Each structure stands twice: as structure tokens, then as C-alpha cells.
Amino acid sequence: MSKTYVVDIDGTICDWEPGRDYTLSRPITERINVINKLYDEGNIIKYYTARGMGRFKGRSDKAIETFHAITESQLDRWGCKYHQLILGKPSADVYIDDKGINDNDFFGN
């Protein structure tokens, strides 16, 4: 039975520079390969990011307008397989979720 995986981008499948210059983000290939394998196994992959949400004080419309094309291009360039890219995730220091898992625990590092 397939599952739906919602995956963060920055700090999860890529490293990003201080100050959040997303164009300088570097892919973490090993992690992308794990997510791509889940995709290949028939699971649904959704990337969900807070890119721009802090900068635009929670205005998802501005974050989407500014960062959607850049982010989509990066995911494609990095070879990410996915079904959906969602911007507008609220910016936070801590996310509490009954279905959440820490990225280091998930990827085993």
C-alpha cells in the first residue's frame, strides 16, 4: 500500500547558506536518492517548504510568487522525483505533529 510523504526542502534535502539565499542551496544527493526510491516504489511525494514565509511575514502569495519557479527549477536540476511542490508552509522554530519524524532519524544520520 502506498503512502504519502510530505518532505521539507531546506536543511532536509539540501544545505542552504546563512541568510537564506536559496539560489546557493546545495543538494544532499544521498537524501534525494532515498526520496526518489520512495517515489519509484509508488509512494506519493510532496515537497512542502516555508521558503520566503519569514521574509514576507507569512504572506504565502508573495512567497509563492517569488520562490516557486526557483524552487521547481532546483528540484528538477537536482533530479528530485515528486508529485507536488507546495510553498506557504508557516515559518516556525518547532513543528509538532503526530505523524512527524526528524530528518536525521528518517535518513539515519
Region locations from a protein language model:
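Catalytic phosphate/metal-binding cores of nucleic-acid and nucleotide-processing enzymes, i.e., regions
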Residues: 1-109
